[in-house]
A protein has these predicted regions:
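Fe(II)/2-oxoglutarate oxygenase catalytic core
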Residues: 1-167, 175-199
């Protein structure tokens, strides 16, 4: 049994659900409600280059929009259920059940990457005092990518290939420095968030 703390759980979310989430993202994007990360985060194209939409567990607190409100709730709940199934397997394997209390972050990102785009620089999730509560990175791959688009880990020498319906979980610390490689053919859709400390 390997203990590199990078776990991939296949076929967690079914094909139709993944495609419905992608369809929802495209509707949001066409309505002008998605953002590009360069604009939002003020980063260079060579650093982060993707389109992104933030889901929240409480969309009712945001300005009402007929496209987002109902669908956001459904998608968030679907992601949440899939996450807890994988999370329980993860914490059992790595014996995290007795140490700390965690929950799923209240925000989930849906991201679209087209050929040439990606999160090109090496980075980790606990990269500032504001992000120190991020225990685990959680990523759901919404479609298969034939070439490129892997999540690559610097120190583990691992490349996780996007596979529709699979969830990847890894630690948020510098030990799991990673990057999103550019897609070479086709588009890549993912959802990601974090398991965070409650206290």
């Amino acid at each position: 049994m390997e203990y590199n703390f990078v776990e991939v759980y296949d076929n967690v979310v079914d094909k139709q659900t993944c495609e419905n989430i992608i369809k929802h993202f495209e509707e949001v994007k066409n309505a002008g409600l998605s953002i590009d990360r360069q604009s939002k985060e003020g980063v260079a194209k060579l650093t982060k280059d993707t389109d992104m939409y933030d889901l929240t567990e409480t969309p009712d607190l945001l300005p009402s929009n007929s496209i987002t409100s109902a669908n956001d709730k459904i998608i968030f709940q679907t992601f949440k259920e899939a996450f807890w199934n994988c999370y329980n397997q993860y914490i059992t394997k790595y014996d995290l059940t007795q140490t700390t209390t965690h929950t799923l972050d209240g925000y989930v990102k849906i991201q679209k990457t087209v050929p040439g785009q990606g999160y090109h620089v090496w980075h980790w999730e606990q990269d500032s005092v504001h992000h120190g509560h991020r225990l685990l990175l959680v990523m759901l791959y919404l479609n298969d990518v034939e070439e490129g688009g892997e999540t690559e880990f610097l120190y583990q020498g691992i490349r996780v290939k996007p596979k529709q319906g699979s969830i990847m979980i890894c630690p948020g610390s510098f030990t799991h420095t990673h990057r999103g490689n550019p897609t070479l053919t086709g588009e890549k859709y993912v959802m990601n968030t974090w398991a965070v400390y409650i206290n």
